[in-house]
């Protein structure tokens, strides 16, 4: 049966070479549009997510603020600030916390044998590395537990600062002065995409153990507290518990949103996911309508084929061919046209995406758009659309063919 259907399709193809070829090209172009647009959309979405996580990887950053309500005889406008003991209190009291880090911060002067510069320095704990995606290049490391416990004078540098202070590229293991205190460089951060930042990008950051920072600068209060839940679903619960604990300790109303400020990267990721979905839907819609126009061409060809083969259809029905045989023949031909055009389009689109990926573009627009990504979702969606269009383009002409009256069709010229 399938062999006969293919033979009949090839005969029709020879009769309608130009029209069929143009339709296949249209299907091919529509397929390229759908896959390429979705690939670039997926690349953009991943790049935006990477840039967001460059500032905070599924964390919440809590900052002290000012009370906006009077409470138990205390006036509004009081300053609320975090201390290191609060970090330990959160760690003991909130089991949904996966990791937590204190964070001090101030501007400092750094001096090496080659250069002097000013930058923002933070005093943090060990989990800060993963929470802020500050991973070291080969040969170096981030701060460890012994650095914190022993208040070591070690520093982890952002790549821009490291290049400025050590232009020969040998920062790791060398010494520098921070506010006239000697430190050893234990690591340099890998380059990363960062779209959310405070006090400048992490590439210009210097990081030391929070214990060393406190001992050196005698800071009583933290700049912020970073918390990552064991699961994003605990985000609101942890925020509520932090507010409750701080409200009891520092005597303010737990619903006073101004007393504690939160920079919520988990919520930002949810918003980004919704934006990414919107981009996907929009780009898919553009490609879908391109394919839909091509599908009209397929339907047009099938109507022409039905008209030209009216006498043949009548003969088949006269000798016993059933309607389902007639319908399946034209649906198969429509699907086959879509399959040929779609297959060529998939190969070309894959080649375009692979070619762009191989260029490894960096800087400027490339840093924002990212590299296109061929995803399984895009392939499944495209296949589904092609099948739907093929069926729609074949069903209506096929039904018309099935309704042909054998007697009348035999007189058709």
Give the label of every model feature segment.
Residues 3-4, 398-413:
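Short cytosolic juxtamembrane segments of multi-pass membrane proteins
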Residues 5-10, 14, 18-26, 33, ...:
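Transmembrane alpha-helical interface segments in multi-pass membrane proteins
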Residues 42-120, 127-130, 145-146, 163-164, ...:
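Hydrophobic, regular-secondary-structure patches
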Residues 127-142, 152-253:
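Mid-to-C-terminal secondary-structure elements
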Residues 226, 242, 253-287:
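Peri-transmembrane interface segments
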């Amino acid at each position: 049966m399938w062999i006969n259907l293919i033979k009949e399709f090839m005969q029709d193809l020879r009769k309608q070479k130009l029209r069929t070829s143009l339709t296949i090209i249209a299907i091919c172009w529509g397929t390229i549009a759908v896959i390429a647009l979705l690939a670039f959309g997926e690349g953009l979405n991943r790049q935006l997510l990477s840039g967001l996580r460059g500032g905070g990887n599924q964390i919440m950053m809590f900052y002290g603020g000012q009370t906006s309500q009077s409470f138990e005889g205390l006036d509004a406008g009081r300053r609320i600030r975090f201390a290191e003991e609060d970090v330990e209190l959160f760690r003991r009291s909130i089991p949904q916390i996966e990791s937590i880090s204190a964070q001090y911060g101030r501007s400092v002067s750094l001096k090496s044998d080659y250069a002097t510069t000013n930058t923002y320095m933070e005093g943090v704990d060990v989990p800060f590395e993963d929470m802020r995606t500050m991973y070291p290049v080969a040969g170096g490391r981030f701060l460890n537990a012994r650095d914190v416990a022993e208040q070591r004078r070690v520093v982890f540098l952002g790549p821009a600062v490291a290049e400025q202070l050590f232009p020969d590229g040998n920062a790791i293991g060398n010494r520098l002065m921070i506010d006239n205190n000697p430190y050893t460089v234990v690591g340099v951060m890998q380059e990363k995409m960062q779209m959310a930042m405070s006090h400048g990008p992490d590439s210009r950051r210097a990081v030391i153990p929070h214990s060393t920072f406190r001992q050196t600068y005698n800071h009583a209060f933290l700049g912020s507290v970073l918390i990552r839940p064991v699961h994003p679903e605990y985000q609101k619960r942890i925020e509520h518990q932090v507010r409750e604990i701080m409200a009891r300790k520092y005597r303010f109303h737990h619903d006073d949103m101004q007393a504690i400020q939160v920079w919520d990267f988990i919520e930002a990721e949810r918003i980004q996911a919704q934006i990414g979905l919107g981009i996907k839907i929009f780009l898919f819609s553009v490609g879908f309508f391109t394919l839909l126009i091509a599908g009209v061409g397929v339907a047009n060809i099938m109507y022409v084929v039905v008209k030209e083969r009216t006498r043949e259809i009548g003969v088949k029905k006269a000798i016993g061919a059933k309607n389902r045989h007639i319908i399946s023949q034209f649906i198969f031909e429509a699907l086959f046209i879509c399959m040929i055009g779609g297959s060529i389009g998939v190969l070309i689109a894959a080649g375009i995406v692979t070619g762009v990926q191989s260029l490894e573009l960096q800087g400027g627009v490339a840093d924002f758009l990212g590299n296109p990504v061929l995803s399984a979702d895009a392939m499944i969606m495209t296949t589904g659309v092609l099948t739907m269009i093929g069926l729609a383009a074949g069903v209506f002409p096929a039904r018309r063919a099935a309704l042909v009256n054998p007697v009348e069709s035999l007189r058709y010229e």
